[in-house]
């Protein structure tokens, strides 16, 4: 099954099970994100990627410039291990890793999670590629893709739903 099919199936099943106010908040957040213009501001194919130096899940640091010195890099940004959609994407990336490696590229995932949460995500999903922590979303902002979805949804639902970004502490 393709990643799109998995995501669509999950969303249909999930939306059928949640209360209407959660569905409404999620739909509203999706519409706000689409209307925000983020897609127009994000880096495009062929744009120069800004360098970064981020901590990985095992206590090291990874610099994009160093990765690029050895070949192409597939870079995936995700919201965090708390996001079921993101976990489906990470699983699909893990399945694609042998082909990515065969083509001479490296795969790296980036999220606003703390390194401890990134380690948990790595272990839970049995990932064999680097998972980096972009606390404060500095790198995501440099790529033009940062947004505040979790806090907005939590405010809409009047419930604290921690995102494990290190910012709620």
Model-predicted regions and their roles:
Residues 1-48:
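N-terminal targeting signals for export/organelle localization
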Residues 89-140:
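Structural microenvironment flanking redox-active thiols in thiol-disulfide oxidoreductases
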Residues 31-72:
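Long amphipathic N-terminal alpha/beta scaffold segment
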Residues 134-169:
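Thiol/selenol-based redox catalytic cores and closely related redox-interacting motifs
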Residues 64-93:
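Short active-site neighborhood of thiol/selenol oxidoreductases, capturing the structured segment around
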């Amino acid at each position: 099954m393709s990643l799109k099919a998995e995501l669509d199936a999950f969303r249909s099943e999930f939306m059928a099970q949640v209360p209407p106010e959660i569905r409404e908040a999620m739909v509203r957040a999706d519409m706000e994100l689409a209307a925000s213009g983020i897609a127009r501001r994000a880096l495009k194919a062929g744009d120069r990627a800004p360098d970064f130096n981020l901590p990985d899940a095992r206590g090291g640091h990874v610099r994009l410039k160093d990765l690029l010195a050895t070949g192409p890099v597939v870079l995936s940004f995700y919201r965090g291990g708390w996001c079921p959609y993101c976990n489906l994407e990470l699983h699909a990336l893990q399945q694609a890793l042998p082909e990515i490696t065969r083509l001479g590229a490296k795969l790296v995932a980036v999220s606003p999670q703390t390194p401890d949460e990134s380690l948990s995500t790595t272990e839970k999903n049995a990932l064999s590629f680097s998972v980096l922590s972009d606390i404060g979303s500095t790198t995501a902002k440099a790529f033009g893709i940062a947004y505040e979805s979790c806090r907005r949804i939590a405010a809409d639902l009047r419930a604290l739903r921690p995102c494990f970004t290190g910012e709620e502490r």
